[in-house]
Amino acid sequence: MALMYPFHVAQPPLNWSEHLWVSEVSPAKESFITTICEHRQAQWDNQDLLRHLQDSVAILTREDQRHVNAVHAAANMPANP
């Protein structure tokens, strides 16, 4: 029964005949809650997309990126005649 109620419902009713005790949700609050849910879903989707990659491929820290850029720049420098 707990799965039937969204997370912003304050307390589920004790009897089926009782009404839900919910504060009125303004359009701004509804938009905020929707944005949070969409952001969480996007994070889960991104994690699923990167799950098959190794950590060394999927995660590059700033230090790794600086090292890659330095090596790439050194390889492209012309040799002195």
UniProtKB/Swiss-Prot annotation:
Highest taxon of source: Eukaryota
GO BP annotations listed: anaphase-promoting complex-dependent catabolic process; cell division; meiotic cell cycle; protein ubiquitination; regulation of meiotic cell cycle; regulation of mitotic cell cycle
Tissues with expression: Expressed in germ cells.
Key word Cell cycle present: yes
Keyword annotations: Cell cycle, Cell division, Developmental protein, Meiosis, Mitosis, Ubl conjugation pathway
Observed phenotype of the null mutant: RNAi-mediated knockdown is largely embryonic lethal. Fertilized eggs show a metaphase-to-anaphase transition defective (Mat) phenotype. Arrest occurs at meiosis I at the one-cell stage of embryogenesis.
Pathway annotation from the record: Protein modification; protein ubiquitination
A GO term from the CC aspect: anaphase-promoting complex
Subunit architecture: The APC/C is probably composed of at least 12 subunits: apc-2, apc-10, apc-11, cdc-26, emb-1, emb-27, emb-30, mat-1, mat-2, mat-3, such-1 and gfi-3.
Entry function: Probable component of the anaphase promoting complex/cyclosome (APC/C), a cell cycle-regulated E3 ubiquitin ligase that controls progression through mitosis and the G1 phase of the cell cycle. The APC/C complex acts by mediating ubiquitination and subsequent degradation of target proteins. Developmental role in early embryogenesis and the metaphase to anaphase transition in meiosis and mitosis. May be required for germline proliferation. Required for male tail development and hermaphrodite vulva formation.
Protein name: Anaphase-promoting complex subunit emb-1
Gene source species: Caenorhabditis elegans
